[in-house]
Amino acid sequence: MERIKELRDLMSQSRTREILTKTTVDHMAIIKKYTSGRQEKNPALRMKWMMAMKYPITADKRIIEMIPERNEQGQTLWSKTNDAGSDRVMVSPLAVTWWNRNGPATGTVHYPKVYKTYFEKVERLKHGTFGPVHFRNQVKIRRRVDINPGHADLSAKEAQDVIMEVVFPNEVGARTLTSESQLTITKEKKEELQDCKIAPLMVAYMLERELVRKTRFLPVAGGTSSVYIEVLHLTQGTCWEQMYTPGGEVRNDDVDQSLVIAARNIVRRATVSADPLASLLEMCHSTQIGGIRMVDILRQNPTEEQAVDICKAAMGLRISSSFSFGGFTFKRTSGSSVKKEEEVLTGNLQTLKIRVHEGYEEFTMVGRRATAILRKATRRLIQLIVSGRDEQSIAEAIIVAMVFSQEECMIKAVRGDLNFVNRANQRLNPMHQLLRHFQKDAKVLFQNWGIEPIDNVMGMIGILPDMTPSTEMSLRGVRVSKMGVDEYSSTEKVVVSIDRFLRVRDQRGNVLLSPEEVSETQGTEKLTITYSSSMMWEINGPESVLVNTYQWIIRNWETVKIQWSQDPTMLYNKMEFEPFQSLVPKAVRGQYSGFVRTLFQQMRDVLGTFDTVQIIKLLPFAAAPPEQSRMQFSSLTVNVRGSGMRILIRGNSPVFNYNKTTKRLTVLGKDAGALTEDPDEGTAGVESAVLRGFLILGKEDKRYGPALSISELSNLAKGEKANVLIGQGDVVLVMKRKRDSSILTDSQTATKRIRMAIN
């Protein structure tokens, strides 16, 4: 009441009224702006004048018991007057200082865990190195980049479920934690955050940073991995750049990088197999990157790269609607065209069948090192505006655009025959034939293209056929610009189809991607890539093929053993033996195979001549198409370590060494696994042909006719004698027993008798 009375008195004075009405604050709109709603309209100002007051903070009454009235300097820390309109106490900012110095200490153990992404960022910056600043024009192009280093790749929905489960486990609501990564993260975080005193909302925000990829469409001139983007404001301005080397790597960048390498290797390998699509899927499903299944990564990771997109398309995932040609991503920004087959003649009078795009179209072209805007009509380039890092990159973009334009003068510039093939030795399609031809040498193309005088336009210059800049003349329709062309910003994905040869088409039938577009660049992956598929064994060279083949046989020995005796042809045709064939000298592949198959047939025919170690050792050689020959071998050659190495038919060698005591096999000195069963199963190698139910009488006896196989043996009557072929082509004389009771003793005596009979 006191206050109101005072105000009334003030208002009765004319001066007060004048000040209030003449100054501009009486605009109703302004008053409304600053007084309506709970949202603070000028936080900085508000903070300034609040902090200028003696007691700007309010606190719970209990604070009086916990903080003295004055600090060591005798300054008052809290006021005895209550806060108007609440039962809280007015407190001075000095109280905060006192509390920080003398207040109760709480455990800090959870802070680095909750604020993990911040702590890691500090470490990266501490160990990073900033180089000199260079002043130059920055060709920045907007790209979709990852702005959040150190995250897992969960979808927003998956992350939400994990966060609810970790932070608010008792809240109601259905949560589905299905993927492996969700379960692992939930378990890990629950353990880490036990008894955590940090506000749950804060924890939830921080978890979101850790789990979800956040992308922004930003102008970038240099590296695009997240550890560079987090310092974008420090490394590039409008006219300057500062060199920077990150002080650490983060898993999400490593995953992106390794995924691209794995996908490229898989697409390249699939291209040369009999059924590329089936092979590609088999490899994607059996590959792990940094211990996580590649198919799981593909489902979550937004990386757009040609090989990665081919793998996604094969899995039935949607991909970007832009298409790829010559390593550039093309996005049509306006116009339309229809496709017609046309036959054209090259400068060498070779006929090419090309699909001509009829109609006016505009495209953006974005590559790693150059970007461009292309306007074209039917088989005519109207305008190409290029920008790039250097002369070489600009030239690459110009060649791709000229070929893409399908102009007559480009086709006539071909010298010599076009016969480029892909990895599977199949001819490339005509457009890629042309592209390869000019990528090798574009001199004639540039010379024949034609030049024109140019107008002086800001930010644009001409480029001559020898790729030097000029302000007077330029290649017809081509200009070089200082400004880059932004990447296509939309994240829209479309349904695509993929054919057997890995050509990806949109629903209109336009080819978006094909294996020809997959880069040949080789890199070293940051995370371990484990290719379980036999098709990828050769990626690490011949030794890896050898070790992997034998490891595979040992791991699958139970099923291999049954197939070996019941359905050998099916076993020989297994794709796991395919890579091995490249190690066997071409000239002897068929002979080796015929020899080993005959040997195996003898083992099958003569009961008990089954020798596990020898079957494992020789099995891969039987996979080649066999040649019938009388050749006998005591060793087989494989090409590893740059020369032929021998595998002995009997006994150990550096290539294949079986240790009877430990029952372990080493191949080229590398452990290839253990045999779970005893290879000596009552036999002592091939010579111990244990013929149950037969008595071994001695050496071959010609009077009893030619040597029989095991199936013929079963027709003998009791007491009848015959010659039998065993093991390595040795023949012995046997007699079918008259009584069945003594069959058991055969096993023990046969071994000794065969030795005597043979020697």
UniProtKB/Swiss-Prot annotation:
Matching Gene3D superfamilies: Polymerase Basic Protein 2, C-terminal domain (3.30.30.90)
Site (Avian adaptation) location in chain: E627
Keyword tags: Cap snatching, Eukaryotic host gene expression shutoff by virus, Eukaryotic host transcription shutoff by virus, Host gene expression shutoff by virus, Host nucleus, Host-virus interaction, Inhibition of host RNA polymerase II by virus, mRNA capping, mRNA processing, Viral transcription, Virion
Pfam families the UniProt entry points to: Flu_PB2_1st (PF20947), Flu_PB2_2nd (PF20948), Flu_PB2_3rd (PF20949), Flu_PB2_4th (PF20950), Flu_PB2_5th (PF00604), Flu_PB2_6th (PF20951), Flu_PB2_7th (PF20952)
Gene Ontology cellular-component terms listed: host cell nucleus; virion component
Biological process per Gene Ontology, one example term: viral RNA genome replication
Principal subcellular localization: virion
Motif Nuclear localization signal: where in chain: 736-739
Gene Ontology molecular function terms on file: RNA binding; RNA-directed RNA polymerase activity
InterPro entries xref list: Flu_PB2_2nd (IPR049110), Flu_PB2_6th (IPR049114), Flu_PB2_C (IPR049115), Flu_PB2_CAP-bd (IPR048298), Flu_PB2_middle (IPR049111), Flu_PB2_N (IPR049106), INV_PB2 (IPR001591), PB2_helical (IPR049113)
Subcellular localization: Virion; Host nucleus
Subunit description: Influenza RNA polymerase is composed of three subunits: PB1, PB2 and PA. Interacts (via N-terminus) with PB1 (via C-terminus). Interacts with nucleoprotein NP (via N-terminus).
Family annotation (HAMAP family): INV_PB2
Family of this protein: Belongs to the influenza viruses PB2 family.
Chain's role: Plays an essential role in transcription initiation and cap-stealing mechanism, in which cellular capped pre-mRNAs are used to generate primers for viral transcription. Recognizes and binds the 7-methylguanosine-containing cap of the target pre-RNA which is subsequently cleaved after 10-13 nucleotides by the viral protein PA. Plays a role in the initiation of the viral genome replication and modulates the activity of the ribonucleoprotein (RNP) complex.
The name this protein goes by in its record: Polymerase basic protein 2
